[in-house]
Structure formats: C-alpha cells, structure tokens
C-alpha cells in the first residue's frame, strides 16, 4: 500500500518488511499490485491507479488475470479495513478510515459491463492524452486497459516506448501488424470482462470498421471518437514532444493532412476545445 513506498535518494523504493518469510513475501504479482491500485483508488488517485496498471500490463501481459483484479482489490481493501479497525481503539480517528476501506471493498465487487472506446484522429490531435483522461472512468476499478498503437509498435519492435524507430517500422506491413496486435489485445481484454480504450490514427475506413467489429463480436458497447484539430496546433503539438512514444513529426502531420479519410461516422470532437474531456464523457453516456 502507499505506506510501503518512500523516496530514497530521489527514487521511489518499495518495501514490505516481509523478507523474513518467503511464504508471505512471494505471492501472485497481480494480487500484490492490487494493493497499490486499491490504495491509490481510495486516496482519490484514480488516474494514477489506471496509469500504473497499464504500465504493468505493457511489461507483463496478464490480460487473463484482469477478471480477478476487482476481487483482488476488494480483498486488499478488506484487509486494510480490518487492520485499521483493530487500531481504532487506541486511535479513534482511524475508525472513519476503516469504514471507508470497508465501503470500498463493497464497491469494488459491483459488476461492470465491458465496453470498447476507440479514439482516432491524425497525429497531434491529443488522442493519447484523452485516452488516459477517460480510462479510469470506464469499467471496473482501476479502469480501462489503454491500448496505444504507439506503445504497441515499440513493444513489437522490442524497444522502449521512448526509442525512435526507423522509417521501415512504419511501412504498410508493419502498421498492419500493429493494428492486428491492437485488435487481438482488445478482443482478449473484452473477453476477460475488462473495458478497453484503443488509441490509434484509424485513418482508413477498413481499420475503423475492423475495430468496431471487435466490439460486435464480443457483444459489448462500442463508441468511436474522432478528434479534429487546427493543423497549426497539430504541427506545434508534435514538434513539442520530448520522450514521447509517438515518432510522428511535422512531416508526418503534413502527409496525413492529405489522406482520404472516407466517411467518418464516429462522434467528431473538436480537440482544441477547452471542454474536450467533458464532451467526450457526454459522448460515452
């Protein structure tokens, strides 16, 4: 939980004080992670909880375990409720904390229907930013699995998200492989009962149709959001990126602006609007 994380020499250090007993210290990693996710959620850090889960799943594909995650988190909340309640006699202020953990444990067991939300748009329109802003609001805590084409492309290439790839990594065959991987992961996550936010350009009508078909086959709700932005803003956004999983450049934006996008029947949103997030949330209801 959050009490077992400290900053040491400027770096986060996790400790559990259980090193004396391997039977306690060595457990299922997803169950261990559930403690941190639960505590972040309880402390009002839903976005951080979702981000943490997604970065873990990027590194270790445990999609099949997602069906158990709400139960794991509920168990962790119940444990914190019990431990905190036993301290309430000497520390009365902890009674409210124990009750809050107990209520959270109940809430975490409420079933949520899986759904697929897809965010498309040309480079520099803010797809990834919106995806992460929405993810913690969807499905069971700590929110949706975010599948980003930029991160998946780097993973398929065997490099870190921040590593820039050569031009051939964006050839048609390579891009087709990225979209195929994204859709396969989306299908697997939906099958596990989780919600998904997919983030990619989806410039081709066939790509948009294919991702919608994933939702239809899974029998879940589908929402497609298409972001549109002033070209000058798009150019400025990609030019300002540092250490970003996206390799898009101003030249890439210029090329994309000439695409024939076909008919876009997704909900179109002005990516430059101050109330973009609010409009996106409304589109999901």
Predicted segments with their positions:
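Conserved phosphate-donor/acceptor-positioning beta-strand/loop module used by diverse small-molecule
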Residues: 218-238
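Helix-rich C-terminal or lid/interface subdomains of diverse kinases
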Residues: 47-109
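Hydrophobic positions on the alpha1 helix immediately C-terminal to the Walker A/P-loop
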Residues: 130
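Conserved lysine of the Walker
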Residues: 127
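Conserved substrate/cofactor phosphate-moiety recognition/catalytic segment
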Residues: 135-194
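Active-site Asp-x-Gly
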Residues: 7-53, 57
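Small-molecule kinase domains that catalyze NTP-dependent phosphoryl transfer to phosphate-bearing small molecules
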Residues: 240-285
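Hydrophobic anchor at the beta1->P-loop junction of P-loop NTPases
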Residues: 119
């Amino acid at each position: 939980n959050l009490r077992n994380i400290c900053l040491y020499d400027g770096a986060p250090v996790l400790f559990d004080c259980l090193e004396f007993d391997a039977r306690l210290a060595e457990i299922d990693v997803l169950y261990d992670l559930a403690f941190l996710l639960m505590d972040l959620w309880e402390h009002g850090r839903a976005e951080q909880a979702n981000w943490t889960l997604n970065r873990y799943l990027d590194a270790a594909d445990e999609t099949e375990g997602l069906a158990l995650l709400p139960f794991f988190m509920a168990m962790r909340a119940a444990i914190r409720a019990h431990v905190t309640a036993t301290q309430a006699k000497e520390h009365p202020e902890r009674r409210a904390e124990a009750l809050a953990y107990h209520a959270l444990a109940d809430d975490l067991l409420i079933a949520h229907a899986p759904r697929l939300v897809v965010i498309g748009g040309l480079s520099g329109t803010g797809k990834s930013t919106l995806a992460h802003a929405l993810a913690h609001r969807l499905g069971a805590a700590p929110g949706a699995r975010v599948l980003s084409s930029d991160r998946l492309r780097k993973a398929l290439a065997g490099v870190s998200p921040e590593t820039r790839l050569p031009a051939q990594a964006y050839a048609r065959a390579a891009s087709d492989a990225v979209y195929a991987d994204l859709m396969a992961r989306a299908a697997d996550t939906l099958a596990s009962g989780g919600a998904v936010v997919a983030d990619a350009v989806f410039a081709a009508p066939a790509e948009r149709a294919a991702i919608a078909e994933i939702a239809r086959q899974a029998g879940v709700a589908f929402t497609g959001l298409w972001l549109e932005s002033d070209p000058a803003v798009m150019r400025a956004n990609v030019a300002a990126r540092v250490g970003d999983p996206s390799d898009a450049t101003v030249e890439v934006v210029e090329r994309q602006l000439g695409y024939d996008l076909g008919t876009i029947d997704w909900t179109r949103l002005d990516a430059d609007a101050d109330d973009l997030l609010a409009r996106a949330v409304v589109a999901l209801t």
